[in-house]
Amino acid sequence: MKKGIKKVFKVIGRIFLVLLILFFILTIIFACMKKSLRQKNVDILKADGFVNLVSAGDYDMNVNIFGNGKYKIIAMPASWDYGLPVEMKQLSEYLDDDISFVAVTRPGYGISGETKKDVTTEYIVESTRTALKNAGVETPYILMAHSMSGPYVTYWENKYPEEISGVIFRNSISSAEDEMPEKGVPKLMKNAAVAIGTFANKTGWTTAMNALFAEEDEDSYGVYAKDVLAFKKAAVPNYGEVKNYNINMKTAWDSIQANDIPKVYITNDFETLEDVKEYLMFLYGEVDEELAQERFEESQSEWHKEHRKKISEYCKSLGNCKEVNIPASHDISDQKPEEFAKEIEKLIDRIK
């Protein structure tokens, strides 16, 4: 019996050793391939005019400029939003010629370079300002935050108000959000995710997995689907944003001083059951009635009402901030670009 158990453990040990050796070999291969795989996607994007790498200080940032309008909207991405440049190019088609979009990214997003520095709110803002100057994009700017970039835009417009003529919060993170847990199992899980993700980025595993498994999303991006796929395959998003989530938010919220810069905070809350059905049809091409009812009830919950109240308090603390709701997807502009474009034009009318 004991010999049988020893034999089983010996077999398991050998299998584990083989897997470990295989992992080590693949890591070496992927690390060697990382640069060439990223360059392949850069070449695809360059052919379609989506490459404009400029110095952001210690790394190169891809700064895509769409249009030559007087009013320059600096669009900042959500967490790991690979397709922002394409989204802004598509959205620009709904706006007047005097409005231009400038899509900026963060370290490791799309084809932007990587950084060894700590990804803090201050670092993101300063590196983005440097990149815009090097790209020849002059102030004043209209900042547009989506989701995770909310704290960065909040800090920017409070730290350098002389550079900013307007702000658009597109369903972005605000002081209404809860902090990440800083103890117990949730903290351990976060730290593990950061460690594994950082290792995968550095060793080429992220790039290799994207090259093997990432797929085109033709329904959302049409003729630009291959470009969004190229951005995704090239991306090695920095996990410093996850690690520094709480401190980055605190830095932003502590900087707030009410000012007169025109702002609009656009949410995507469902107001009716029909809103939910429209969203599900947009997302899946069909409507699950049970799911629609469930999502609608969630949108009417006490927690959601309290969250919306906190967003209103956040807007009030910023000064001169109007609240607008467009029932839609998280991105808003992908499902309802015309309605979103109208709100941009209304903000610019306030700036003029």
Question: Model segments located where?
Answer:
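A short loop-to-beta-strand scaffold at the N-terminal edge of the catalytic core in hydrolase folds
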Residues: 55-66
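Conserved hydrolase catalytic core segment
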Residues: 139-181
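Conserved HGGG/HGGXW glycine-rich cap/lid loop of the alpha/beta-hydrolase fold
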Residues: 65-111
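Conserved serine/cysteine hydrolase catalytic core
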Residues: 219-319
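Catalytic active-site module of serine/aspartate enzymes centered on a nucleophile-bearing elbow/loop
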Residues: 308-309, 313-352
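An N-terminal hydrophobic leader/cap segment in hydrolases
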Residues: 22-52
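Active-site loop/oxyanion-hole signature of alpha/beta-hydrolase fold enzymes
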Residues: 106-142
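N-terminal Sec-pathway targeting helices
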Residues: 2-24
